[in-house]
Amino acid sequence: MSDYIIRATAAEGQIRAFAATTKELTEFARQAHNTSPVATAALGRLLTAGTMMGVMMKGADDILTIKIEGDGPIGGLTVTADSKGDVKGYAYNPEVMLPPNEKGKLDVGGALGIGVLSVIKDIGLKEPYVGQTILVTSEIAEDLTYYFATSEQTPSSVALGVLMNKDNTVRQAGGFILQLLPGASEEVISTLENRLKEITSITSLLDAGNTPEMILEHILGDFDLEILDKIPTQFACNCSRERIEKALISIGKKELQEMIDEGKTIEMNCHFCNKNYPVTVEELKGLLEKAVR
């Protein structure tokens, strides 16, 4: 089954909901970045959140970036998503290894440590929207719940999870975001809160064979759930040789000349997908001619 996101509403428009299965894109990220199990779990959770938050945006060219920077050994995570289901991301220190936490789970909170969550939305305005909150647990889902409440004034429930196989490949990954819209009744709020208390972990639901549709039906079935959209999602990077060359031209003649003088092929690396682009001395000379300063 390929990865996808379900967009839905419930309770006559008082609740909006998103649920996703992201096993393949998380496994793609694991292979691209050679992430350790705890880094895979952290990055997979944020990629899952990023792709769901990306499809919340309306414009075809809208871009969402989520950054987490902490004092833990992983350093941080960056994820970028568009409104069409494409997402990419990386961990600052992908090889970090940590013992399990006290619950015997991968210690994402310990890997990230104390820090800050930033959400940047570039939606075609003069300045991008930037919302910033502290990390409350550093487990990512609770931090995003706190972000939605404080920065977007939207009461939300966020669940994110990554389950690993014994060989450290990804067994399951996915999540949901449920949001109460303005005017939601007290009855809807209390019923939803009680229903959410019954939910086991998102990964155990996925591992039991539940699809995103079934998970939303399980939580919101009594609220006249209406599924609006099924959106494919994938890890997709838009890096290219042309972009790398533009970046090199932009650094200026002095730096380019220094690279040429070293007389070696250089390797340019894309942070997001870890692809390397070799650039020869002859190619650098060609770029030097195009540089304006």
State where each predicted segment sits.
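Interaction interfaces in information-processing and related assembly proteins
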Residues: M1-D229
